[in-house]
């Protein structure tokens, strides 16, 4: 069964009838307006081929005779209506009528044209139904579908039908266009600038030199049909999805790649058929709702694009039905550099890129070619409306999140060198140029072939290439969990994306205890450490700014005066609450009882001021004796020295320890952000880095420490830094928050919630217990300072240091200083021994806590790339190099008591 292309659908057609839809009723107003079309235009008759069989008199027209016969029979509309409700039009020429017309008018008989179908046994041409392999140009036009019931065209319906719908006419036009093709090549430079406003048929007539005839001439002349009727006809045709420019098709020779089957609408880039330069009869028909006639919705949105087709570099002007109406205002001029339309040998890559997979659902064969090479530095596609055309408009609602690269030719491409070409299937759109910064760092510039320019490295082993996020499998290999059991070597810690680079070589350029030490020699913008950690001294009682050391503690002036009056007075204070009132800068006067208790807990005593004065007096006397050099001594001086020795509980050693004690260090934690494991642990690591710098300065300022070998100095600090920080944190927690929380820093205090959130609750509980020991044992600040110095010399390698003998002597001197401080306030030897036992037992309890924290930090460093915890460079180096030695037993602490 033959299939005829209809309006918006495909339906079977009987051999002698064709159907039209209900749109015919919309032309009623046009029929009433068009009554006297007038004589045929002379140019229309001139261009009509002999095969059209035009009649000179209306009375002898076959259509006129059929109309009269149907009128005599009665109502012709009643019996020609099809089963589906469509109106059926009889064939224009039955075999008998064709023979009668041939006999009655022998001068009008003609030979069949090559493209026309011939009736069996007859030599007359017959208009066959459009086969599936014929182009849409041979389909019935809008006016030919009106049929014999069009009253306004009753006098010239046969002529119009023959002109608009006879295949011989199209064949003659094709022959004339092929004969004049060489003239078009000479006018190539003129055709690239002019705009075709009358459609493809008008361009063909201009090329052949024939006088131009508009559609108005075919519709009945220039005076009988009003302009409003013509505009109404056009509007109704467009609203029904019809193309009124049926004559504006090109010949098969000219329809190379932009024919009506594959051409896009509204001046867009033509969609290319799979086989280049295929002849026109091979073009399969499409339903009108999927073919070029589907242009009603795009016309309203892209009216600015509607205009004459641009001409390519080869001078061929390609067009299709429904796309040739244009005015001078809607013209788009395309420069010759934009080769959107090509004739002859078009690039297959560009052909596949311009193919519209949504508007033309055909089985297009052939794999897609890679995108055409672009500029080496091109990272952004310069969007041109002509690059999208109707393909973009038609597929905008279908592929909103789809592959946009296939619609506009895959123009989003990365650099031609330095990175792999982008595939058209990727929907990533690069919006960063080579000069702009990206989310993960500067983008690799186009044309660079270095591996570093392939893409910026993002966190956790991913890199961002120009077209998206791909896995970086070769740049990172996760470190396996390794617990040393034999020979300890350097442990490879994670890649630099988890370690901040702030420290260079280990304290190589340290110029002294108070010198200008930089964090990293490679960073010129780093200021001295004192700039980052200014000495912040706060009152240990209320937290206000401290004015100095008063009565043995660092306090402000207000707490100094309060303690003097409260300690010397005989008034006893009672707390109205539970002896746990908050004492700060604003509430320090609310409860004198809790404030005085806190003063005693901080180590304030009335005798500390007198002892300090006596110590200064001893220094003055020793200086005078050394300067005098007299062998004889004054008895009064002997009495003074002996009196000072009796009160010598504040030795010079303690003065040095108080002077070199580090100040308060902040962690830089943002307490406004919600607590998380990564944020808390990263802040602890940052605090450890800052405190480690102060530990180095403090250790090098200790008496006798610089006499050690340089390697021994570094080893002692790297082995004991964890115990020193834990011990100092316990003291801060005791003095500031009464051991209820862990006071790591003023901006980083761990309560119960943060202890659980940090996943180190057991370690935090042990550190809080250590802080409580300071209160239970009533540790004084002097004892704390001496114990902290002794803790530095409490862990050494099993094989010993390079100068082990001097280390043992230095450690013994610090033990004697601790015993002297204990004996200073106690006259009973038994009490001194008990106190010494308590303090040394407290020192031994620090080592297990430090070892447990060593294990935790080492495991955290191995998994830092998975848990997003940052480790400063110096911390990562110590943990990866020195901590495994402690965990493996190569380095062991020195205990006072048997464990």
From Swiss-Prot:
Domain of life per record: Eukaryota
Region (Interaction with CCAR1): 571-898
Region annotated Disordered, chain positions: 35-146, 175-222, 436-471
Keywords assigned by UniProt, alphabetized: Cytoplasm, DNA-binding, Isopeptide bond, Lipid-binding, Lipoprotein, Metal-binding, Nucleus, Palmitate, Phosphoprotein, Receptor, Steroid-binding, Transcription, Transcription regulation, Ubl conjugation, Zinc, Zinc-finger
Annotated positions binding 17beta-hydroxy-5alpha-androstan-3-one: 685, 732, 857
Site (Interaction with coactivator LXXL and FXXFY motifs): 700
Modified residues (Phosphoserine): 61, 75, 251, 630
Family: Belongs to the nuclear hormone receptor family. NR3 subfamily.
Protein name: Androgen receptor
Species of the source: Mus musculus
Gene that this sequence comes from: Ar
């Amino acid at each position: 069964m033959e299939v005829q292309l209809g309006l918006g659908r495909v339906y079977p057609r009987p051999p002698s009838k064709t159907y039209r839809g209900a749109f015919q009723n919309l032309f009623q107003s046009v029929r009433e307006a068009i009554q006297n079309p007038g004589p045929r235009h002379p140019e229309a008759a001139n261009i009509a081929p002999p095969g059209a069989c035009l009649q000179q008199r209306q009375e002898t027209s076959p259509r006129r005779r059929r109309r009269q016969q149907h009128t005599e029979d009665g109502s012709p509309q009643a019996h020609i209506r099809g089963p589906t409700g469509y109106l059926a039009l009889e064939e224009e020429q039955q075999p008998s009528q064709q023979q009668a017309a041939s006999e009655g008018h022998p001068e009008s008989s003609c030979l069949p044209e090559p493209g026309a179908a011939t009736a069996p046994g007859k030599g007359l041409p017959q208009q066959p139904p459009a086969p599936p392999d014929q182009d849409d140009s041979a389909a019935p036009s809008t006016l030919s579908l009106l049929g014999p019931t069009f009253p306004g065209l009753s006098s010239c319906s046969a002529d119009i039908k023959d002109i608009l719908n006879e295949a011989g006419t199209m064949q003659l036009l094709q022959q004339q266009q092929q004969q004049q093709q060489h003239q078009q090549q000479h006018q190539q430079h003129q055709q690239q600038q002019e705009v075709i406003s009358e459609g493809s048929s008008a361009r063909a007539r201009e090329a052949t030199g024939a006088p131009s005839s508009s559609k108005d001439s075919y519709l009945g002349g220039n005076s009988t049909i009003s302009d409003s009727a013509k505009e109404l006809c056009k509007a109704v045709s467009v609203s029904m999805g019809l193309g009124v420019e049926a004559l504006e098709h090109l010949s098969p020779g000219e329809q190379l790649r932009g024919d009506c089957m594959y051409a896009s609408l509204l001046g867009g880039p033509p969609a290319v058929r799979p086989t280049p330069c295929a002849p026109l009869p091979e073009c399969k028909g499409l339903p009108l709702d999927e073919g070029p006639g589907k242009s009603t919705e795009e016309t309203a949105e892209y009216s600015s694009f509607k205009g004459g087709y641009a001409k390519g570099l080869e001078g061929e002007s390609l067009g299709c039905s429904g796309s040739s109406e244009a005015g001078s205002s809607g013209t788009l001029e395309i420069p010759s550099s934009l080769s959107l339309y090509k004739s002859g040998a078009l690039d297959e890559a560009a052909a596949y890129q311009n193919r519209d997979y949504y508007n033309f659902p055909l089985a297009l064969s052939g794999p897609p070619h890679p995108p055409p090479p672009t500029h080496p530095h091109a990272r952004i596609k310069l969007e041109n409306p002509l690059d999208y055309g109707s393909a973009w408009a038609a597929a905008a609602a279908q592929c909103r999140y789809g592959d946009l690269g296939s619609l506009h030719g895959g123009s989003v491409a990365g650099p031609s060198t330095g990175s792999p070409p982008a595939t058209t299937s990727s929907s990533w759109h690069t919006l960063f140029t080579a000069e702009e910064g990206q989310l993960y760092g500067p983008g690799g510039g186009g044309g660079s072939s270095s591996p570093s320019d392939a893409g910026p490295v993002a966190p956790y082993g991913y890199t961002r290439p120009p077209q998206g996020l791909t896995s970086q499998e070769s740049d990172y290999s996760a470190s396996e969990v390794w617990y040393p059991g034999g020979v300890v070597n350097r442990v490879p810690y994670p890649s630099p994306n988890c370690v901040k680079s702030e420290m260079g070589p280990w304290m190589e350029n340290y110029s002294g205890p108070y010198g200008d030490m930089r964090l990293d020699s490679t960073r010129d913008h780093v200021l001295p450490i004192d700039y980052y950690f200014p000495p912040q001294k706060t009152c240990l009682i209320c937290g206000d700014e401290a004015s100095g050391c008063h009565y043995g503690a660092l306090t402000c002036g207000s707490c100094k005066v309060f303690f003097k009056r409260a300690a010397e007075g005989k008034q006893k204070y009672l707390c109205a609450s539970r002896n746990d009132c908050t004492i700060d800068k604003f509430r320090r006067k609310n409860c004198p009882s809790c404030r005085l208790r806190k003063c005693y807990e901080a180590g304030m005593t009335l005798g500390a001021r007198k002892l300090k004065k006596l110590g200064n007096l001893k220094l003055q006397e020793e200086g005078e004796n050394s300067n005098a050099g007299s062998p004889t001594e004054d008895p009064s001086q002997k009495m003074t020295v002996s009196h000072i020795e009796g009160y010598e509980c504040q030795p010079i050693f303690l003065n040095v320890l108080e002077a070199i004690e580090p100040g308060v260090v902040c962690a830089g934690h943002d307490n406004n952000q919600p607590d998380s494991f990564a944020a808390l642990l990263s802040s602890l690591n940052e605090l450890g880095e800052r405190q480690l710098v102060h530990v180095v300065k403090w250790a090098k300022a200790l008496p006798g420490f610089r006499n050690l070998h340089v390697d021994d100095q570094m080893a002692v600090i790297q082995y004991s830094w964890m115990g020193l920080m834990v011990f100092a944190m316990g003291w801060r927690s005791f003095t500031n928050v009464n051991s209820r929380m862990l006071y790591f820093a003023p901006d980083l205090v761990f309560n119960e919630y943060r202890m659980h959130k940090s996943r180190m609750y057991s370690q935090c509980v042990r550190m809080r217990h250590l802080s409580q020991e300071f209160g239970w044992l009533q540790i004084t600040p002097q004892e704390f300072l001496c114990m902290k110095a002794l803790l530095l010399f409490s862990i050494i390698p099993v094989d010993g240091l390079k100068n082990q003998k001097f280390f043992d002597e230095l450690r013994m001197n610090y033990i004697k200083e601790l015993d002297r401080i204990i004996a200073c306030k106690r006259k009973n030897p038994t009490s001194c021994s008990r106190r010494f036992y308590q303090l040394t037992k407290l020192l031994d309890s620090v080592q297990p806590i430090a070892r447990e924290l060593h294990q935790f930090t080492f495991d955290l460093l191995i998994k830092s790339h998975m848990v997003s915890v940052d480790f400063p460079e110096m911390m990562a180096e110590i943990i990866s190099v020195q901590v495994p030695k402690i965990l493996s037993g190569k380095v062991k602490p020195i205990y006072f008591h048997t464990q």
